[in-house]
Amino acid sequence: MAKSIKKKKSPPTEEQQLKRQKASFKRKIRNMFTGAGFTYIATNDKEMYIGHRKVEVDALFIFENIWLVCEDTVQKTGIMDHIRTKNEAVGEIRDNLPDFISKLVELFPGSSDLLQKYNPDRIKLFGLYIPLNDPMLTPDDYYRFGNLTFVLPQTFNYFKWIVDCIKHSARNEIFRFLKLTSNQIGKISSGSDTQKITAPIIYPREFTGITDKVRVVSFMMSAEDLLNTCFVLRKDNWEDSIWLYQRLIKKSKIKQIREFLEKKGEAFYNNIIVALPDDIAFRDQSKKYVGIDEINDLESNCELILTKEMNSICVIDGQHRIYAHYVSGVDSKQERRIAELRQQLHLLVTGLVFDKDVKAEERARIQSEIFDDINSNATKVPRTVLTQIKRIKNPIDDESIAQSVIEALNKEGIFRGLMQVSSLDSGRIKTASIVRFALRYLVTVKPAEGKHSLFEYWTGDKEKLLSIDDRELQNYVKYCSEILREYFGAVRKNMRKYWDDDTSKLLSVISLNGFIIALTRQLSVNGVQDFDFYDQVFSRWSFDFSSEKFPYTSSQYRKFSNEILENAFDIPKETLETI
């Protein structure tokens, strides 16, 4: 009998590919929120009339009184009309929330208890817009579409990672993103002592201090309380701040510690390091409140009183030991055992107590220094984390300024969204080598003898900048970014076919470093010029940036800069040797 010949499958059409992409993205969104403990209501394709318009919600996720009305899109073009429509729809839902609830109960009678658990005035409803691709919104766009909270790709990938690692315990991260406090979630609390955490102080003599304005106090705290009140300043999260220095949590490390806890049932003896919130209090054995300066006697049996507020205790070291106690949401043997240990095990915690007048940036510097000291001889810290710590400790260090310039370039202009500024980013351009081997020399405030940098040409207040004035630092970063946009704007104009070609070498690290080094070296000849000057320079230069013909390999940055200086800037060879 002849074998039947299998018919070759034809490749999926563009429409089929788009359909699969949409389904995959929706599945990821659903898994992320349900993985964090939210309940999914399948509102997709359910049209309803709310207020004065017809609305359709892609997905609804509920935890207690927190409702997340989610809109997603895989569109790359024409996205502004979609955002406007969804912004108006969320506004209509908020204005007519009782009608929205009634309609949902009608559509989903099996979920009526969940949908009617809270009065409408207690429900906190958020309109989340989750795009697969960054829509590149301006500040004006964010203001105009104020009914929506945008979960951009980096933020979504961050939440997806955290939920995958610590399951339901990642919910507090989402609440922090939404700027929610504990008293806004669930039923209204009475505000009694049940909302306080009492922790016995172990070493009151230890608060001799790191600086005059920082004290240190050690105490015992249950894993559950710590898990429910802590947060971590991870550099890959959604916050637009330079004061973030912690690395991403590691799933393998969490798993290893969790298995140890399940097997041994013991806490780790090395202490957790945290920064405590400002509203802590101290109480002696007679329950009288005392100041921190009065608790220097071990015999007084003092207690530390903390408000039971999520995201209030900043973890400096020990995030894996804390989060290994996560709530999985799965009724497994391991979860039942860990649930017992969360309440039973008390971890040794050393907390920094800052004077209330210590600014956020100074607190971050102290915290990052401690993190650096602790981890310098432990697990190898990624270079991006070390750069971030250096940036916090010394914001005017050349690499610190260079990193700030990279982030500024990534926010607007020709490089917007192209830079990989986070380990979760899908940006086309990796930046660590650009900062380290090229950009730092262009922006340094202390160029080597005989060398030049943009600092020389900047007309801002140099003395203030050198004294680490934050406003002047931002002004200098803005200046450097604008110069680079003009320079590379001319490059893009004259080499557009290579700029738009993902396979070309124009936007490779080798090429970009060569261009930046060339710009730095030519300062001694031309100084700082404008777009028209650079446009003229590159209009008369022709170079093949195709991946097949590009002749330079890794680390040949200076050699490529010679090509640019000699053949684009027309700088003689004998001059090249001196700059």
Spell out what each predicted region is.
Residues 3-6, 10, 47, 51-57, ...:
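Accessory terminal alpha-helical modules
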Residues 1-28:
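Interdomain/boundary linker segments immediately adjacent to catalytic/signaling cores
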Residues 35-45:
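Short Pro/Gly-enriched beta-strand edge/turn motifs at strand-loop
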Residues 22, 38, 94-95:
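Terminal low-complexity regulatory extensions
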